[in-house]
Amino acid sequence: MYRRLGEVLLLSRAGPAALGSAAADSAALLGWARGQPSAVPQPGLTPVARRHYSEAATDREDDPNFFKMVEGFFDRGASIVEDKLVEDLKTRENEEQKRNRVRGILRIIKPCNHVLSLSFPIRRDDGSWEVIEGYRAQHSQHRTPCKGGIRYSTDVSVDEVKALASLMTYKCAVVDVPFGGAKAGVKINPKNYTDNELEKITRRFTMELAKKGFIGPGIDVPAPDMSTGEREMSWIADTYASTIGHYDINAHACVTGKPISQGGIHGRISATGRGVFHGIENFINEASYMSILGMTPGLGDKTFVVQGFGNVGLHSMRYLHRFGAKCVGVGESDGSIWNPDGIDPKELEDFKLQHGSILGFPKAKVYEGSILEADCDILIPAASEKQLTKSNAPRVKAKIIAEGANGPTTPEADKIFLERNIMVIPDLYLNAGGVTVSYFEWLKNLNHVSYGRLTFKYERDSNYHLLMSVQESLERKFGKHGGTIPVVPTAEFQDRISGASEKDIVHSGLAYTMERSARQIMRTAMKYNLGLDLRTAAYVNAIEKVFKVYNEAGVTFT
């Protein structure tokens, strides 16, 4: 059974009655039993959640195995949705056969299908030779191509790429992007290499992936991740298109996150951070959730802290700042800064570009202690995995944790946040903006035309004809004795009169995707009485969608 594979431990079988009246009321909010009606939350009550956790994932509570951690979260979702999957099966099997089918497919979904481990030599600029290690994990091919970033870090490991690949599968499913999950890592510190050496490493890694069948527009499509960006993606695209893909007209679709000149798309660089903003916006504007947290809806009076001032942290900060929230703290690996009056993201970005660090920023002071425990409304961990653990979770002061990074919260910390009535907007939803816009870029590369190019002039002419038609109708009705009756477009309409640009289409598509997925998560949380356990609701949605693909496609050669 799939739950035994994850060694699920039911942490508590105690009912609400054993916990006292306050806990009983709050337990009703989170739904102790499937099918139990949830009570209206009473002010001041702290919900207490008890869910299925993976024993394997929590055996090292402050530093759990990352892949087992993801498997544990999967098990929680699977345990809740199993009965519905059995009920929805439209086959002529009996109840036991249907349940066996469901459990069998869930066992298929859970493991990582392929892991490629590579070692290859490069010659450094000083003439010395070095062997570089790299990995590419493909979690699922239920949809192809597989999709996932490439990171450069000395912390890269098989466990990490497997965990991140599995998260990508569920992330794509949550936001309805038709990809399987994958992830790659090269075990280097890019700061220790020249640009020429990094190009050698990137191009050689691309060739090794190509030789093993781990890259291609319809096979496996990498993207930027930690310490990689447009430059590295351009090298990958050029290497693939110049070698194994030289006969493939779609060769540049082998990777996303490219520069515009290489087939990239407007809005990709900021996509993950913009997705974080939209995700927070969708939940913070939902009055029912804010009433549980004791907060007012909207961003206007909210403060936030960002851990990690890279691509995700910077753009999350920019958009939240633009829409009225105040950034009071920013943390990086070399230290943190604090200003209760607010930190301007553009000024901080310029300072870091000039000095290489946020420390010393003149409009903020150094923050002593962990920035994760700073006083704020919204905490955005946008650095690396396993930052919020059993040790520091009790001291977190934020009421909303928005997971900009992948896997920043351990299972034990997640349990503590539920018990403390803290909302966690989960990673597999919140940071899906990057893969969503990567999907748009991939489609652009396959179509060989930018969004909006075919309709710009037609839409502009149509809009002017519409305005002229209105003007002529008014003049026929009221006459011209007082002069013409000009119909002047508003400033907002004037901006859109030529139709949507590529950036407009990308931003609109991303906003719609994040809003629709948020509504799906909210409905699932309500349906299963999950309360603030949005992570489990997101996993339930992902599991249902992936299960449907496997079930309807059939399992070959069984």
Swiss-Prot record:
<dbReference type="GO" id="GO:0010044">
    <property type="term" value="P:response to aluminum ion"/>
</dbReference>
<feature type="modified residue" description="N6-acetyllysine">
    <location>
        <position position="211"/>
    </location>
</feature>
<feature type="modified residue" description="N6-succinyllysine; alternate">
    <location>
        <position position="545"/>
    </location>
</feature>
<keyword id="KW-0007">Acetylation</keyword>
<dbReference type="InterPro" id="IPR006097">
    <property type="entry name" value="Glu/Leu/Phe/Val/Trp_DH_dimer"/>
</dbReference>
<feature type="modified residue" description="ADP-ribosylcysteine">
    <location>
        <position position="172"/>
    </location>
</feature>
<feature type="modified residue" description="N6-succinyllysine; alternate">
    <location>
        <position position="415"/>
    </location>
</feature>
<keyword id="KW-0521">NADP</keyword>
<feature type="binding site">
    <location>
        <position position="516"/>
    </location>
    <ligand>
        <name>ADP</name>
    </ligand>
</feature>
<feature type="modified residue" description="N6-acetyllysine; alternate">
    <location>
        <position position="457"/>
    </location>
</feature>
<feature type="modified residue" description="N6-acetyllysine; alternate">
    <location>
        <position position="365"/>
    </location>
</feature>
<comment type="subunit">
    <text>Homohexamer. Interacts with HADH; this interaction inhibits the activation of GLUD1.</text>
</comment>
<feature type="modified residue" description="Phosphotyrosine">
    <location>
        <position position="135"/>
    </location>
</feature>
<feature type="modified residue" description="Phosphoserine">
    <location>
        <position position="227"/>
    </location>
</feature>
<feature type="modified residue" description="N6-succinyllysine; alternate">
    <location>
        <position position="183"/>
    </location>
</feature>
<feature type="modified residue" description="N6-succinyllysine; alternate">
    <location>
        <position position="162"/>
    </location>
</feature>
<feature type="modified residue" description="Phosphothreonine">
    <location>
        <position position="410"/>
    </location>
</feature>
<dbReference type="GO" id="GO:0072350">
    <property type="term" value="P:tricarboxylic acid metabolic process"/>
</dbReference>
<feature type="modified residue" description="N6-acetyllysine; alternate">
    <location>
        <position position="352"/>
    </location>
</feature>
<feature type="modified residue" description="N6-acetyllysine; alternate">
    <location>
        <position position="415"/>
    </location>
</feature>
<feature type="binding site">
    <location>
        <position position="171"/>
    </location>
    <ligand>
        <name>substrate</name>
    </ligand>
</feature>
<comment type="similarity">
    <text>Belongs to the Glu/Leu/Phe/Val dehydrogenases family.</text>
</comment>
<feature type="modified residue" description="N6-succinyllysine; alternate">
    <location>
        <position position="503"/>
    </location>
</feature>
<feature type="modified residue" description="N6-(2-hydroxyisobutyryl)lysine">
    <location>
        <position position="147"/>
    </location>
</feature>
<feature type="modified residue" description="N6-succinyllysine; alternate">
    <location>
        <position position="363"/>
    </location>
</feature>
<dbReference type="GO" id="GO:0004353">
    <property type="term" value="F:glutamate dehydrogenase [NAD(P)+] activity"/>
</dbReference>
<feature type="modified residue" description="N6-acetyllysine">
    <location>
        <position position="548"/>
    </location>
</feature>
<feature type="binding site">
    <location>
        <begin position="141"/>
        <end position="143"/>
    </location>
    <ligand>
        <name>NAD(+)</name>
    </ligand>
</feature>
<protein>
    <recommendedName>
        <fullName>Glutamate dehydrogenase 1, mitochondrial</fullName>
        <ecNumber>1.4.1.3</ecNumber>
    </recommendedName>
</protein>
<feature type="modified residue" description="N6-acetyllysine">
    <location>
        <position position="399"/>
    </location>
</feature>
<feature type="modified residue" description="N6-acetyllysine; alternate">
    <location>
        <position position="162"/>
    </location>
</feature>
<feature type="modified residue" description="N6-acetyllysine; alternate">
    <location>
        <position position="545"/>
    </location>
</feature>
<feature type="modified residue" description="N6-acetyllysine">
    <location>
        <position position="386"/>
    </location>
</feature>
<dbReference type="GO" id="GO:0005759">
    <property type="term" value="C:mitochondrial matrix"/>
</dbReference>
<feature type="modified residue" description="N6-acetyllysine">
    <location>
        <position position="326"/>
    </location>
</feature>
<dbReference type="GO" id="GO:0005524">
    <property type="term" value="F:ATP binding"/>
</dbReference>
<feature type="modified residue" description="Phosphotyrosine">
    <location>
        <position position="512"/>
    </location>
</feature>
<feature type="modified residue" description="N6-succinyllysine; alternate">
    <location>
        <position position="390"/>
    </location>
</feature>
<feature type="binding site">
    <location>
        <position position="322"/>
    </location>
    <ligand>
        <name>GTP</name>
    </ligand>
</feature>
<dbReference type="InterPro" id="IPR033524">
    <property type="entry name" value="Glu/Leu/Phe/Val_DH_AS"/>
</dbReference>
<dbReference type="Pfam" id="PF02812">
    <property type="entry name" value="ELFV_dehydrog_N"/>
</dbReference>
<feature type="modified residue" description="N6-succinyllysine; alternate">
    <location>
        <position position="527"/>
    </location>
</feature>
